[in-house]
Amino acid sequence: MKNYSQYHQDIMNQKLENIRNNIQCSFEFFPPKNSFLEENLWSTVNRLSLLKPKFFSVTYGANTGEREKTYDTVQKIYKKTGIITAAHLTCIDSTPHKLKEIAYNYWNSGIKSIVALRGDTLEKDYRHTMYAVDLVLLLKKIADFDISVAAYPELHPESKNVKSDILNLKKKVDAGASRAITQFFFNIESYLRFRDNCIKNKINIDIIPGILPVCNFQKLKRFSSMTNVKIPKWMLDMFNGLDDDIFTQKIIGSSIAIDMVKKLSCEGVKNFHFYTLNQSDITYSICHILGL
């Protein structure tokens, strides 16, 4: 008689082994605003460094103080861990001259990776507004930066349609982008359709899914409404009645992220970018369960 218990265990082990051998992860942080948050960031960096990620990235604020914090944080993480650390850089609130200065400083200090973004629109009316494609072109003229750009499986909030979104991404790729990191999402079919559209339009770079482990569902709903990210009904049902139970929310959030990585891995996805929110516990748990 067939030992089904052993049979199912072997299947599970094989699936985890396939994931362990075929995928890599990267992690996003944001610059800390005070000493308490800085201590928390370093605790997170130190713990996630143990997973030997492909790279880290550090977000970029829209004012001068935040910019300097990004630069300092990128430098410190890279020097302390030796792991490639990509600096986010936005162009909507800057000038070509200032961007060149920032880029030269990064390159000359050993930071060769940039996440090139337009940045969120601001109330102030900036003339000569630059776009992400302009920033990619500017960076490539300065040095051979390894450049990541943004992609939107569920449409950029300001885009007219899918076609314009794909065209914009293609322009960034043709300008020299090496990969695209997506906005977070929860509908796997949205990502797969987007990837298919990219292939049809000869966009041949890696489209890395951005994974956001849910820690606080109420905050997620508010943020999703601003970013055009759709929350599926099954997910609303899962978190129903848990507004005051953050612990259970984290467990469910971990389960959703693990399931997403497994399913996307079966579809040939090999790289995943985690939005950590500077918290290591849930992200580390997810990666540990996946055997990373």
Curated annotation (Swiss-Prot):
Pathway: One-carbon metabolism; tetrahydrofolate interconversion; Amino-acid biosynthesis; L-methionine biosynthesis via de novo pathway. FAD binds at residues 60, 62, 88, 118-120, 132, 152, 156, 165, 168, 171-172. The keyword Oxidoreductase applies. It comes from the Bacteria. One of its GO terms (cellular component) is cytosol. The active site is at 28 (proton donor/acceptor). Its EC number is 1.5.1.54. It is an enzyme of class 1 (oxidoreductase). One of its GO terms (molecular function) is FAD binding. It catalyses: (6S)-5-methyl-5,6,7,8-tetrahydrofolate + NAD(+) = (6R)-5,10-methylene-5,6,7,8-tetrahydrofolate + NADH + H(+). NADH binds at residues 59, 183. GO terms for biological process: methionine biosynthetic process; tetrahydrofolate interconversion. (6S)-5-methyl-5,6,7,8-tetrahydrofolate binds at residues 120, 183. InterPro entries: FAD-linked_oxidoreductase-like (IPR029041), Mehydrof_redctse-like (IPR003171), MTHF_reductase_bac (IPR004620). The keyword Amino-acid biosynthesis applies. Keywords: Amino-acid biosynthesis, FAD, Flavoprotein, Methionine biosynthesis, NAD, Oxidoreductase. Pfam families: MTHFR. Its cofactor is FAD. Belongs to the methylenetetrahydrofolate reductase family. Catalyzes the NADH-dependent reduction of 5,10-methylenetetrahydrofolate to 5-methyltetrahydrofolate. Is required to provide the methyl group necessary for methionine synthetase to convert homocysteine to methionine; the methyl group is given by 5-methyltetrahydrofolate. This is 5,10-methylenetetrahydrofolate reductase. It comes from Buchnera aphidicola subsp. Acyrthosiphon pisum (strain APS). The gene is metF.
